[in-house]
């Protein structure tokens, strides 16, 4: 598809400097009508100003889409991922990764509604997000062209971006320039939604540097967290959390409430070096307070209700599932296949988990379920009437048979 074939473009638009520059660049470079989409994923920033900024850039009011998709995000993306207990490379709870397929889905839906030939995003050519956005868009509508300005334009420095903005009358906030109009050192590259906030860049680019305490925007430091522990109870049904302390909550409200608990008690900070899909290593710091609590609770209720072999197989599949999400394959048949298998294990994952929150730690202190496979008649250390300990002898000997045979053979040598 050539440039002249593109009449309408749907842009993932934050209202910030970079996407405002992209908006103008699309108008000039493609001579296309731009439609903006701003997602409210619970990032904690006011999204309505994006409407006025888009209109100020010449976008028709009917072409400005601002959608509150927090409930859909948590219910249809975050919760399914947590049923899998997904963690990438042992520590990353995939807060950015899981938001991208939903944004891609909305871009495609708006493009279909408005008859657009293309969608566009502000991800750079060095990161994972370009892959996530584009795999999602192409999986849902392969006829769409995806425009990635960072891979096309010559605006390859902060100075050139600011110069372009000045030239085209794009508003530049004080966080980007000093009192003389010169570029400031860029702030951390941050991304936030209801599940997490991430930080990259600046002194974090040296993996030896400890993050500054002022960087962390959500959580108290564990040292400054309350000196008294707090206990909460999370209720589960079909593998998803449905209540806190007996009160049923919507998915987004539940996650927001867990975030509040986690922030208060300094829970959910991680500092990792991860392997990006494009091949390089990158250092990132993340705050995932509610997700950290949720993961602990979910594993606890599964420990009561999942069959042993189903649980072990699920743990074996988890790294592959997490990798698919990290690399942008949410809409792939293999992810959907794994999801179906994971969801099949969750029908009896219900009950309550009691947790102790204290200075960065989440400790499980109790769990109950009407579907529990734990039977104290068998598990007791006291006298029981149901388990004949002599049965273990044959069980052990049969499982040791290969060792016995091999040992006899080896002893003959």
UniProtKB/Swiss-Prot annotation:
Pathway where this protein functions: Amino-acid biosynthesis; L-arginine biosynthesis; L-arginine from L-ornithine and carbamoyl phosphate: step 2/3
Residues binding L-citrulline: 92, 97, 128, 132, 189, 198, 274, 286
EC number of the protein: 6.3.4.5
Residues bound to ATP: 12-20, 39, 122
Annotated GO biological process: argininosuccinate metabolic process; L-arginine biosynthetic process; urea cycle
UniProt binding sites for L-aspartate: 124, 128-129
Substrates-to-products reaction catalysed: L-citrulline + L-aspartate + ATP = 2-(N(omega)-L-arginino)succinate + AMP + diphosphate + H(+)
Any one annotated GO CC term: cytoplasm
Chief location category: cytoplasm
Entry GO MF terms: argininosuccinate synthase activity; ATP binding
Xref: InterPro entries: Arginosuc_syn_C, Arginosuc_syn_N, Arginosuc_synth, Arginosuc_synth_CS, Arginosuc_synth_type_1_subfam, AS_cat/multimer_dom_body, Rossmann-like_a/b/a_fold
Subcellular location: Cytoplasm
Keywords: Amino-acid biosynthesis, Arginine biosynthesis, ATP-binding, Cytoplasm, Ligase, Nucleotide-binding
Family: Belongs to the argininosuccinate synthase family. Type 1 subfamily.
Summary of subunit composition and partner proteins: Homotetramer.
Protein name: Argininosuccinate synthase
Species of provenance: Aliarcobacter butzleri (strain RM4018)
